[in-house]
């Protein structure tokens, strides 16, 4: 178990991860958070969904909800409410409705901040190698994934994309090995 400081992803210079235990998904319930991750239409078309899922599973996070859907304008207007007045919003809306996307809820210790580190900078030109965007994104307007930026935002966004009964509470078998009985 890792405690304190930041550490590097294997083979990924410069990518620091937050403080805390190394096996993030297996923390006791009182230490768990949830976050929303959207695999955007460009990544679905390029068949990158499995690559994204694999990165979260390798970090020990637990998938508690997932669905493939064609997002409509109403849902995206709620999700991107803070961007609706921006000049690029019509292009963002066209992009996000251009094909199916995958919405997922991941659970684990410090999952929001860890996910932001894993996803990388919004601008693919500056996203670090080893991050999802650094490895797969080709342009700032086609940046592969969305990830909630705070615990509060995650709670709100999860409510837009999922009904409460769509989140599956299940016990991860690796908790005892990581945290003890």
Curated annotation (Swiss-Prot):
- Which protein are we looking at? Nucleoside diphosphate kinase, mitochondrial
Gene assigned in the entry: NME4
Q: In which tissues is it expressed?
A: Highest levels in the liver and kidney with lower levels in the heart, brain and breast muscle.
What is the disulfide pattern of this chain?
Answer: none
Native source organism of the sequence: Columba livia
What the record says about family reads: Belongs to the NDK family.
Q: Does the keyword Kinase apply?
A: yes
Task: Name the InterPro entries for this protein.
Answer: NDK-like_dom (IPR034907), NDK-like_dom_sf (IPR036850), Nucleoside_diP_kinase (IPR001564), Nucleoside_diP_kinase_AS (IPR023005)
Q: Where is this region: Disordered?
A: 1-22
